């Protein structure tokens, strides 16, 4: 299977679902939900599930709608709003995360943050067979071994990082 071809289609599907997250963010009364559960999470996953399964019929594991695991070699893994609790607190940066596993091994991934504190949407994407990962359509360095942080660089960590410094 050519995962790079599938990747472009997944990016389109996830971008469309991102419009729902943007609309929820812009609601006059703020996003619907409480603590770490938001209505939009289930709505997005219900949009993603059939679109992804139409693209590649296989197993599915969703954070909101549950799983259907039959032993198929492929499995979609979806978190429709990674960062729901912060999203509901009014903090930008949550993301729609979609992965594809082949025999339990990641072969494709898309992380799309349509509402960010620093500018417009951000999409990180990768598929097996690609030489590097892509951010918003542009190649990123595949090795960070010789990279260094600049004063302008941003390092993203969980908002819970200060409560769990050992794992962050």
Q: What would you call each of these model-derived segments?
A:
Residues 69-70, 89, 147-150:
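Solvent-exposed alpha-helices and their adjacent loops that cap or buttress functional pockets
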Residues 71-73, 87-89, 121-122:
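Short, conserved acidic/polar surface loops in the N-terminal third of protein domains
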Residues 76-115:
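Glycine-rich active-site/cofactor-binding loop and its immediate structural neighborhood
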């Amino acid at each position: 299977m050519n995962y790079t071809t599938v990747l472009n289609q997944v990016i389109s599907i996830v971008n469309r679902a991102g419009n729902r997250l943007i609309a929820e963010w812009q609601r006059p009364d703020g996003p619907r939900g409480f603590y770490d559960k938001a209505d939009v999470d289930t709505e997005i996953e219900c949009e993603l599930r059939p679109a992804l399964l139409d693209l590649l019929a296989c197993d599915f594991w969703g954070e909101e709608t549950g799983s259907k695991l039959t032993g198929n070699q492929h499995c979609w893994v979806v978190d429709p709003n990674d960062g729901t609790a912060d999203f509901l607190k009014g903090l930008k940066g949550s993301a729609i995360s979609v992965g594809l596993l082949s025999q339990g091994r990641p072969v494709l991934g898309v992380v799309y943050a349509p509402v960010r504190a620093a500018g417009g949407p951000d999409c990180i994407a990768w598929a097996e067979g690609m030489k590097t990962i892509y951010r918003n359509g542009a190649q990123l360095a595949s090795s960070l071994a010789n990279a260094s942080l600049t004063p302008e660089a941003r390092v993203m960590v969980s908002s819970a990082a200060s409560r769990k410094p050992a794992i962050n």
